[in-house]
Amino acid sequence: MLIPDVMLIPDVMLVTFVILRAKPEESYTTEKETIMRLGTSSPLTHNTPQEWAENQVKLGCRAVVFPVQSNEPKEKIDAYKKAAEEHDLLIAEVGIWRNALASDLDERTRIRDYCVAQLKLADYIGARCAVNVAGAFGPRWDGPYRENFTKEARTETVKMVQDIIDRAEVTNTYFTLEPMPWMVPTGPEDYIRLIEEVNRDRFAVHMDIINMTNSADRYFNAEEFVDKCAGLLGKRIRSCHIKDVHLKQEYTIQLEECAPGCGEFPLKHYVRKMHEIDPDMPIILEHLNTDEEYIKYMEYIKTHIVN
């Protein structure tokens, strides 16, 4: 029920991966595909925890984003945790995706509490990390504002991370911030500086190389930029996102996020470097709109990037 015939990518040559049209009860992966901890940010359409896990495995995933929130029943959390364990699905991350620096103090308090609860959830289920963005000093929760780069913003970001980690008191996971083009941290050096400022052993790195590709230099020297990120951040990286970036021809510089294979980023080099850092490093496909798109581009990753 997961991969319809019409979702094959045109002109894909299948040399190593030969099970695209499997029956629903069969696996869609080969032994070689299962080496890397690929995953998606989508839970895919499902009715039970068991079906969720089975669908992920059939797609070729060995890592998942946990699909249950901290405010849901413990029985549901436990059922998904068990399903992941039974299918050797590494829980890569627990998402937060809220503005923990919101200007409204009541809203900020509610979001901070949610951050703590999500981090505790990550600790309970054994996820590699809980992940958020630093936050924005404007109406859009993840928006681009000059105020994001003030001294006050950095001070508040450091205090926010410390507060969340100190309150959660986790021992089995890490709190991470996804780097962004227009908020702290914007690059590997900035991330190292932030780690030093936060000074908490449960603060680590979430890698999104495309979010940090925010200049012509990083775009045109992408392999060197990947190497720099790997060298500076290395073992601190807990989970990675994968997508692509396209440079549009119109003035002025316009870097557009897109699906893997629709841009020019050296994704093979990126994936190889992350895998060298940790053979269990989760590589998570994100920002697609439908199950069909996740199926399509996961097959692209398996045949063109991992192969």
PLM ranges: what are they?
Residues 2, 8, 28-128, 162, ...:
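N-terminal pre-domain/capping segments
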Residues 2-4, 8-10, 14-16, 20:
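Intrinsically disordered, low-complexity proline-rich tandem-repeat tracts
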Residues 13, 25-27:
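A cross-taxon signal for low-complexity, glycine/charged-rich
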Residues 42-50, 66-78, 99-109, 138, ...:
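Acidic-and-aromatic substrate-binding clefts and catalytic sites of carbohydrate-active enzymes
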Residues 66, 92-94, 128-135, 173-178, ...:
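Short beta-strand segments at enzyme active-site cores
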Residues 85-86, 105-205:
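Active-site acidic/histidine proton-transfer and metal-coordination neighborhood
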Residues 94, 162-259, 264:
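Acidic/histidine-rich catalytic cores of soluble enzymes
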Residues 147-154, 184-199, 256-270, 293-307:
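Short, electropositive alpha-helical surface patch
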